[in-house]
């Protein structure tokens, strides 16, 4: 009897051990999901702000709500996450449904099905062919896998650049956030078809250069195939493109091809206003994303245009739509901090004005809901573009020749943290969005005396026109030494300045900072990457005027400029 009991016990133990060996541990299962799907979503408890700010440096946070942090992991980040030993729950992937592909181009143009990649390419080409006087197709670049990243320019004269304020709508830089992709195609179709029928559309198209990039991450959306089946957030190399832009806090991030192409495109076109469309929540998110303690100089203006987008959506979709956080609006860092985001790059580095608009609380919008998504948003889309018609629209020119002058436009006592704007190098035109009130603008340019225009009246929903005539210095002694070919900003500065590296300055460079008496204050070697601003720490410098010299180690070519430190 005892022997039988022993045998039964042994069998039970062996069975239990065998069952245990077949149970996949959570970490291993997480690895398997990432390996199979290219990504995984997990949740962790919200503990404190400092912990979340550390987390966002290393992984992609999707959202923070109800004391829960939603995190996306890729093949590049899953091992780091596991090593941190977070207490986490895997979010079970709901099988993607409703990704109905159009059977032909005509069906795709009903905007209630997803096009194949080849149909998308054909759609973009068809717009420019059907409306050559209003539309031009351009290529921003190619993805890692060679798919085209395309953009349409819709304007009264699409072949000429620089004659009108440029605005930019872009979507789906996260490949599994698909609703904005179709919404942007639908918007392009709507603008072109209604140019002659709608005075509102005609005003926008005649007075703006409207650029639309429906799909910023085609590899994430289509993978290596032709249809959308298992879209992922990341590009083909596993990078989150909305954490990949230059950021002083994450300087070593490997810039992806899609990011470098987009940076070049945005620098070229000098967009005054832009919006970046996402999914996952329903909210308009405005700068800053990376600083909780800093407010953009135009914070109230940003809040007002974001509020207008959400409130307009409420009128046409009802109060249940776009009501996340502050009834559909948030300052980015209040929600959670993002490093390397496109919104802050556009606003800080390029002096533009960009918001991030989350249009669906589902990542993948089912095809059956694409029409509803359009109905919820198209009035807001037009209203947001109309913001570019307001504010101060100016022209900076030489007082004698009337040639355009590239100048810095600065508001003393107001502008900060790179909020100033610059007049266009080729046309001298600029746009400065401001809240209603009286404003004093100061213009400074190489070789010209500064000009201050006082009591410029900005009225809500109206354009204020301004012509600024600048007088050149009559001799070099009189000029304050703006011989630099470097763009330094912010200038004056407090903690750090940035320099846009000119052509010919790449690789290792010698950086020297010299004070006004000729004393060498700093001398070191830095690595310069073309297109990425050089960040110079000036915290240890006392107030004063300084010259900075960059000399290529290999080429021995030097570039220099002057900046002012104010403590």
What are these regions, as identified by a protein language model?
Residues 446-471, 564-567:
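Structured interaction patches on ligand/partner-binding surfaces of diverse proteins
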Residues 480-489, 493-567:
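C-terminal outer-membrane/trafficking sorting elements
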Residues 365, 371-391, 463-467, 472, ...:
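Beta-strand-rich domain onsets/edges
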Residues 428, 436-447:
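A short, solvent-exposed beta-strand micro-motif common in secreted/extracellular proteins
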Residues 392-400, 428, 468:
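A short, amphipathic beta-strand motif
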Residues 161-307, 311, 315-322, 346-348, ...:
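Active-site/substrate-binding loop(s) of hydrolase catalytic cores
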Residues 7-16:
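Bacterial N-terminal signal peptides
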Residues 403-405, 411-435:
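Short, acidic Ser/Thr/Gly-rich low-complexity loop/linker segments typical of extracellular
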